[in-house]
A protein has these predicted regions:
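ATPase catalytic-site recognition across NTP-hydrolyzing enzymes
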Residues: 1-53
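Long, contiguous amphipathic alpha-helices that act as assembly "spine/axial" helices in icosahedral shell
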Residues: 11, 16, 55, 63, ...
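Short amphipathic alpha-helical "interface-anchor" segments enriched in bulky aromatics
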Residues: 15, 168-172, 197
Length: 223
């Protein structure tokens, strides 16, 4: 009787200890469930340049997705997050990963000048050799919809993207259950990864989708 009165995903989470069941209110639950076969080993292709998408959060929290593109196919090869570091830390991290980079995408507020330095993070990053393209501010929900439409084109490296994927799977709306009202995304530990992912997807829809290679065109490894 109890199972009949509860949504199936809630019953599985609560009583069957299923961690694969969708989180109630999770924005990307269906899309990521359908993408399960595309969460695998997705190696870095040295013949393709790497793009990054960043969320530069408060208290120096940072989330970064790394991806390569062949036509409409998006290969999400890596994810990185940290906090308590300056931009110089991330400049070193980019270099240490050894990828050949093309474009770095950041949120619109990267252009805001900080009171302490009088410089924007856009300017500070440029001084460290990281030149950002600013992603248009289309609003959170439109960004979420852009992500939902883009996930079917994506492959994710299961190992390197595990933390980021865990965030995406649990990124959910804040709901007043008594009144049935949604207050938009719940701001928690999943937010920075999800925001950076939104910027990735918005950038894909706004920028030139052409494949950028090092010195020759590479066919899709999907076969």
């Amino acid at each position: 009787l109890l199972q009949r009165s509860m949504p199936e995903n809630e019953f599985l989470q609560e009583f069957e200890c299923s961690f694969d069941a969708a989180i109630t209110g999770a924005y990307f639950a269906r899309e990521l469930q359908e993408a399960e076969s595309r969460i695998a080993s997705v190696p870095y292709d040295p013949m393709l340049k790497v793009n990054t998408a960043w969320d530069l959060g408060i208290s120096d929290s940072m989330s970064i997705w790394f991806y390569q593109q062949v036509g409409r196919e998006i290969r999400v090869i890596d994810y990185y997050e940290a906090s308590g570091h300056g931009l110089d830390h991330y400049a070193r991290m980019l270099q240490e990963k050894g990828y050949l980079y093309d474009r770095h995408f950041g949120p619109h507020d990267i252009q805001v000048r900080e009171i302490g330095t009088g410089k924007s993070r856009l300017e500070v990053a440029a001084g460290l050799g990281i030149r950002f393209d600013v992603v248009p501010n289309i609003g959170v929900m439109d960004g979420i919809n852009a992500a939902r439409m883009t996930i079917p084109r994506m492959w994710f490296d299961a190992k390197k993207c595990q933390i980021g994927l865990d965030c995406l799977k649990q990124y959910r709306e804040k709901i007043d259950e008594k009144r049935g009202i949604s207050f938009g995304p719940l701001h928690d530990w999943t937010s920075h990864a999800a925001d950076a992912f939104r910027y990735l997807c918005v950038a894909l829809n706004e920028s030139n989708p052409a494949t950028r290679t090092v010195d020759r065109t590479v066919v899709s490894w999907m076969g």
